[in-house]
Amino acid sequence: VKLNDCNLFRQQAYINGRWCDADNGRSVDVHDPANGEHLGHVPLMGGAEAVRAIEAANAALEGWRAKTAKERAQILRRWFELLLEHEQDLAQLMTFEQGKPLHEALGEIRYAASFIEWFAEEGKRIYGDVIPSPAADKRLLVIKQGIGVCAAITPWNFPAAMITRKAAPALAAGCTMVIKPANETPFSALALVELAERAGVPPGVINVVTGDAPTIGAQLTGHPLVRKLSFTGSTPVGRLLMGQCAETIKKVSLELGGNAPFIVFEDADIEAAVEGALVAKYRNAGQTCVCVNRFYVHDAVYERFTARFVERVRELDVGHGSAEGTQIGPLITDKAVAKVQSLIDDATAKGADLLLGGKPHALGGNFFEPTVLGGIRPGMDLLQDEIFGPVAALVRFSSDDEVIELANDTLYGLAAYFYSRDIARVFKVAERLEYGMVGVNTGLISNEVAPFGGIKQSGLGREGSKYGIEDYLEIKYLCLAV
């Protein structure tokens, strides 16, 4: 990886303002998912290092909390500016460790930076309340204060944005943080904290611990000094972490799995729906929590939509993320490839029609062909399992009530999409879909000013928006005798 600023490539963890190795001297290798090439390594840390990071965050808490909201905002603003100044290097680093096309990586860096900019300002607007007192000799006030030491466990699919979406509101609220990034993509996290240090974030305010996830996670969920955990990842792991946090009654934010439906009604703009479907399905090779898992297409437009969709998917360029023109990169690991293949095999064995793709790409490695399946019916695993790959599954429907019932028939409730030009239908369908986010006539829904999160088993809490900082605050009631 060729960077303009070589100091952004860090192969050590960051605890209390110092770059450090694991106590045992061991490390975890990091590879390019496109070709398996060795990129570098990071420390294989465990419980002892996690405890030191937690203690460092706790020691830094008083000083950071004592700064005014404006002072914290100035530091965060500088962090935001540094991300944009180094966006090309950060994008290159991400493409090589995560695999996504360079233009998508660059988009993620700007997206990640937007959360820092947003929450730098939101920290100045943590307002309280004055309550009219029922007693003449009392004055009742409500203030909000940062919750304290926070922990974040972040995924590999958005290795920069999932960190800033948690760290920015935490720091803006006066909290400190310990971050455990995914072992597949640690370099993005370490580059971010290198820039945070340059921006003036004091030692201990933000820490990154790499290594053994279960051991580190057990400390982040079990240590009494940690008052809040934020996790983005799978529902099974989120369920486990939530249970571990129960022992010390931690506040928990969870952004978990999805099973997003994409509905094309008979009055939809078909060309617009096809373009929206491409983005909502194949971005990041289908490896996002809000990627479409199930396409429901009305009988009246099924053939037309399917023909055009297959035509457009066939045009997608698969390759290394750094290559010009690449639209789809590799899956993250060989296990991901095997999972996608097993879901396709299950569907075709049960009668699905293979319209395009269906197997690992000729490029080898972790590349997989963009795939379209038709004739999907109940009982096929991919209707309930999160695919997390470049596979589109198409289902016919004939009425609004039928498709809403089908769309809601899942444990998940993160994102949903639909295309229609009937304004009455738009409101009715949007309100009836059991999802935390609904995209209407668009396949892109996320930004820093909107609340991101799901319902049911897709999670708890919201990230981004004016609501995102609330998860890092405690409400305190003051009763004054006068």
Residue ranges and their predicted role:
Residues 1-34:
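Hydrophobic face of amphipathic alpha-helices that form TPR/SEL1-like repeat modules
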Residues 35-41, 226, 263, 317, ...:
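Conserved C-terminal structural/oligomerization subdomain of aldehyde/semialdehyde dehydrogenase
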Residues 36, 72, 94, 116, ...:
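Residue-level signal for inorganic ion chemistry
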Residues 37-126, 137:
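Glycine-rich loop-to-alpha-helix module at the N-terminal edge of alpha/beta enzyme cores
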Residues 39-45, 60-66, 152, 262-265, ...:
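Short, well-ordered beta-strand elements within core beta-sheets of diverse protein domains
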Residues 61, 65, 80-87, 91, ...:
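Structural signal for hydrophobic packing residues in well-ordered secondary-structure cores
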Residues 128-272, 397:
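Rossmann-like NAD(P) dinucleotide-binding subdomain of oxidoreductase/dehydrogenase enzymes
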Residues 228, 236-377, 440:
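ALDH superfamily catalytic-core signature
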